[in-house]
């Protein structure tokens, strides 16, 4: 819903309060342009070898810089959370998720989260939903600079947590990103 006019009215108000004057539609267009520019730059930097992931903080920071306004990292983080809160309809878990994660933990399994997501708002959402305690490790694409289905993202997780791909199982909600990506890294999936 990042195209929603209500979102961009609120975002332009926040930017304006910080001294960066944007009209809502102008801000949305500038935001979309910055994302495309960053994605293109990352693809060039990586020579097409993987699926790059931008960090939304850099986009917001550049939007302020374009208006000659400096902001703190906390202000960027707060803006990202506001952006997310306005742009989603609700934040809820699929039924049975905490119970399933607890059963895995009770069975002595290690549970890791590998997600195509922006850390600035996803990490607080994971905490808000009470899920942090279930994970032995969390790797978010904006922190890694790469996203699923790129095998490099899976390999980062394997290396960081000293995991053997033959002993791992990937479950997810996207056949291409989750299952095919896992298979490319030698991880079984369901």
Give the label of every model feature segment.
Residues 21, 70, 132-136, 164:
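Conserved H-loop
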Residues 112, 139, 169-171, 190:
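Hydrophobic/aromatic beta-strand patches that form the interior of the parallel beta-sheet core
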Residues 20, 109, 187:
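Short phosphate-binding/catalytic loops that engage adenosine nucleotides
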Residues 147-176:
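Conserved Lys-Pro-Asp/Glu-containing loop-to-beta segment of HAD-superfamily phosphomonoesterases
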Residues 1-94:
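N-terminal helical cap/lid subdomain that shapes the substrate entry/recognition surface
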Residues 71-72, 98-103, 150-154, 174-181:
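Short glycine/proline-centered loop/turn elements that form peptide/ligand docking sites
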Residues 74-93, 97-128, 135-141:
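Substrate-recognition element of Asp-dependent hydrolases with the DxDx(T/V) motif
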């Amino acid at each position: 819903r990042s195209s929603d006019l209500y979102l961009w009215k609120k975002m332009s108000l926040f930017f304006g309060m910080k001294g960066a004057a944007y009209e809502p539609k102008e801000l949305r267009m500038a935001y979309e342009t910055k994302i495309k520019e960053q994605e293109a730059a990352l693809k060039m930097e990586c020579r097409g070898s993987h699926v790059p992931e931008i960090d939304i903080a850099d986009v917001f920071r550049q939007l302020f810089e374009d208006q000659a306004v400096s902001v703190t990292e906390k202000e960027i983080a707060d803006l990202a959370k506001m952006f997310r809160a306005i742009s989603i309809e609700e934040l809820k878990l699929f039924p049975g998720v905490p119970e399933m994660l607890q059963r895995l933990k009770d069975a002595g399994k290690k549970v890791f989260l590998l997600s195509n997501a922006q850390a600035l708002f996803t990490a607080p959402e994971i905490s808000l939903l009470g899920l942090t305690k279930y994970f032995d490790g969390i790797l978010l694409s904006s922190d890694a600079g790469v996203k699923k289905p790129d095998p490099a993202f899976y390999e980062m997780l394997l290396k960081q947590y000293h995991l053997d791909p033959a002993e791992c199982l990937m479950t997810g909600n996207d056949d291409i990103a989750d299952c095919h990506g896992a298979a490319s890294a030698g991880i079984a999936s369901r």
